[in-house]
Amino acid sequence: MSLSSTDAAFSHLQELLDGLPGMQELGEKARLAHAADEAAALDHELTVAHATLALRESDLAEARTQLEAAETAGDATRADHFRREVLFYADQVALAKGPVNEAEFRIGNLLKREGAESLQALQIHALEAATLADLEARIAAYQDDYQRTYELCQSFEVVDE
C-alpha cells in the first residue's frame, strides 16, 4: 500500500474520531427517543389497565346493589344469583389489579433506569419514526465506517526507518 493511501486511511480515522462526540450525542438522542416510545406505550398500558379495573369495580358495585335489593325484597333466588355475581366480579377486580400493578412496576423501573421524574419528562424526547430511523441509519453508517477504517489502519505493517 502506498504512503498516500496509508496517510489517507489514518487521516480518515482521525476525522471519524473527531466526529465521535457528535455521534455520541446522536446515540443519546436515539436512546432517549426509544425511552420515550417505551414511556408512551407504558402510559397507554396503564390507562387501559385502570379503565379495565374501573369497569370491573363498577360491575362489582352494581352486583352488590342488586344483591342488597334482592335481600331487602326477600327474594332468595335473586339474592343467590347476585351473591354469585358479587363473587365473580370480586374475582374480576382482583384479576384486573394485576395489569395495573405490572404497568406501575414497569413504569417505576423505566423512570429509575432513565433517571426521570415522570413519563411525560421522557416523552418530550419522542421522535417521529422516520426521523428516528434516519438517526439510527446515520449512527450505523458511522459505526460501520469506523470499524472498516480502524481495521484497515491496523492492517498496515509497521516499517522501521
Where are these regions (language model features)?
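Extended, charged heptad-repeat coiled-coil rod domains that mediate dimerization and scaffolding
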Residues: 1-161
